[in-house]
Amino acid sequence: MEDFSSFDKNKVSVDSMKRAILDRLYLSVVQSPESASPRDIFTAVAKTVMEWLAKGWLKTQNGYYKNDVKRVYYLSMEFLLGRSLKSNLLNLGILDLVRKALKTLNYDFDHLVEMESDAGLGNGGLGRLAACYLDSMATLAVPAYGYGIRYDYGIFDQRIVNGYQEEAPDEWLRYGNPWEICRGEYLYPVRFYGRVIHYTDSRGKQVADLVDTQEVLAMAYDIPIPGYGNDTVNSLRLWQAQSPRGFEFSYFNHGNYIQAIEDIALIENISRVLYPNDSITEGQELRLKQEYFLVSATIQDIIRRYTKTHICLDNLADKVVVQLNDTHPALGIAEMMHILVDREELPWDKAWEMTTVIFNYTNHTILPEALERWPLDLFSKLLPRHLEIIYEINSRWLEKVGSRYPKNDDKRRSLSIVEEGYQKRINMANLAVVGSAKVNGVSSFHSQLIKDTLFKEFYEFFPEKFINVTNGVTPRRWIALCNPRLSKLLNETIGDRYIIDLSHLSLIRSFAEDSGFRDHWKGVKLKNKQDLTSRIYNEVGEIVDPNSLFDCHIKRIHEYKRQLMNILRVIYVYNDLKENPNQDVVPTTVIFSGKAAPGYVMAKLIIKLINSVADVVNQDSRVNDKLKVLFLPNYRVSMAEHIIPGTDLSEQISTAGMEASGTGNMKFALNGALTIGTMDGANIEMAEHIGKENMFIFGLLEEQIVQLRREYCPQTICDKNPKIRQVLDLLEQGFFNSNDKDLFKPIVHRLLHEGDPFFVLADLESYIAAHENVNKLFKEPDSWTKISIYNTAGMGFFSSDRAIQDYARDIWHVPTKSCSGEGN
């Protein structure tokens, strides 16, 4: 048997790797090569890799204790990890070695990769950003820990039935997770409900005691996060809810089996599913439970780890920093105060001083529905002691506000954590701002916007608290891993330094003038498109032309992301092609993919519209060699890894002022796609780095939208443009759904009679004109390829490594180390 943990990757042979995999197959999977299924082989490979990781994992964690480092704790309700096998192999530097070893065993590596389920513990960009940041923190040797929830079911599996989205459970744990280790020794009680008893103890100290509670246990599961090209292996710790009582035999013995298992199920529901439907009271309560469950277990774990090597808590703020990934974990501020004041018996002022140094808050949105504001009655019932703590935080905070702005009740109201009104609410964003050392936006535009609008009065109170850290993506997954052909071309041309220092991509800009290099670049894109064509056929049974323009709009379905505007443009083009069938146009394949929240009726209707339009367009022989429309179901990280390398045009068309940053825009441009988009989020900074002339920018600016909102009349746009009117008429007349002609009338009503809140019609003409410029350029392959190269060359700033260096330097105050060993 191979002692795999002692291997040096530079000395490992294909044969020894093969023997190590076979050892795991025999001893861990208990199968022989003759009878093993592809999943068995995948599991054997994963367990082999885990053995490789174990040595670095232990060394890293022991080193953190030995050196008494300051640790970063990244709290997030979402982590969209995707698949881990290839990523781990790449970061360990043994991807080719394992591929060759499997080939000697007559197994296709790429087929085995498909055996792994996506770890879909997230909903969209928030969770994927968290995953990129974990990768970068490990690569930069930041002593960091991710903390989240081990959902039994992640984001739902999306199925398209008769054009409609239907949700099915995402059973990502059906075959187990080979990357996790259960840490049964780390089991923490989390208490809900109950009542608070205040009394003076025998020492004369005021005590707040929470009694008659419902207790849930949080069980730790650890996933290793290896850095690229170093020996650092950090941890992602996920919590699973468990009942403290187990099976109640008293119920069972009295014939009440249902009650016996129901009590357990209700408690364990906390970690059952990502984001329950919070449009109903029960869903709201479960979601608030999830958020407190995460922060309570995590803060207890942080304190345990600190006190393992420190006698008292005096230096806690010197050794601990917590980053809140949006408002979901903002309860951590109240929980830290609860532990420091109620359990550790620190004076309030000292505990608050420590807490406000430890915590930092990343804001990801200005959309009102995404800013958490919990009803007071729900909060009081579920977390009575924490409500008292928040009241005390708010009272002391408003005293400061009153001192700065005497007799100004409007200021007190707008800056209060507790919102008054018909239904009192706890404003979690305000709590996060008041309780954090730093508050950051995620693009320069978004950071300015929150200072000017959302947190304007907070910014006026303490401007030094606000900072920008523009998002980034990991070049390991989003170029080296997902686009090996492009990575190979880059390696041969400029070396592979860009994988750890993305700014090195700027070196390829000069090669845009080299016709031979452009030919190689075009060849890479065509082969990637051919691969995507095969995947499309396997997914939805449609044959598409790889020489057509691949126009991709893949992201969460939401009105502000304006998939509706895109499909209205498609209908516009379809009408034009029918009227002028002989015109010289660029054959285009429009690809949509994304999930709508289960309770978001309009978003789900937009999915139905896209599929209905696709049915009509793709079956119309007059146009289907010029225009094809596809909706690829069940969008996820692994699907994005196939779509992005084969994309020609990236749709980033949100209503200006509503997209905080976006990271899909970065991934597409990194892989040579050209961007059509508004001046919103990170598009603005991309235009600065790539060159606005190398993007297709259109639409109203955020300040223009603010002005237009007062007097906007979408009907006048239809009155002035009969072609746009014709598009809406087709929807109203039921052209795309003859079985139910009224089906899409709510969309028309939303646009014409509910004020078109996302300015779809206001930007539609400009959007159509921008697409005409796209078509003109695509007819000139050399010019298109040059700009494609410029796009990739200009993306050096948008690395998650750079973002983490910004956090480490400006917020966390911890050192980072590059793969070359250089520190800062």
UniProtKB/Swiss-Prot annotation:
It catalyses: [(1->4)-alpha-D-glucosyl](n) + phosphate = [(1->4)-alpha-D-glucosyl](n-1) + alpha-D-glucose 1-phosphate. PROSITE patterns: PHOSPHORYLASE. Keywords: Allosteric enzyme, Carbohydrate metabolism, Glycogen metabolism, Glycosyltransferase, Pyridoxal phosphate, Transferase. Its cofactor is pyridoxal 5'-phosphate. It holds the Pfam family Phosphorylase. Signal peptide: none annotated. One of its GO terms (molecular function) is glycogen phosphorylase activity. One of its GO terms (biological process) is glycogen catabolic process. Phosphorylase is an important allosteric enzyme in carbohydrate metabolism. Enzymes from different sources differ in their regulatory mechanisms and in their natural substrates. However, all known phosphorylases share catalytic and structural properties. Belongs to the glycogen phosphorylase family. This is Glycogen phosphorylase. It comes from Chlamydia pneumoniae.
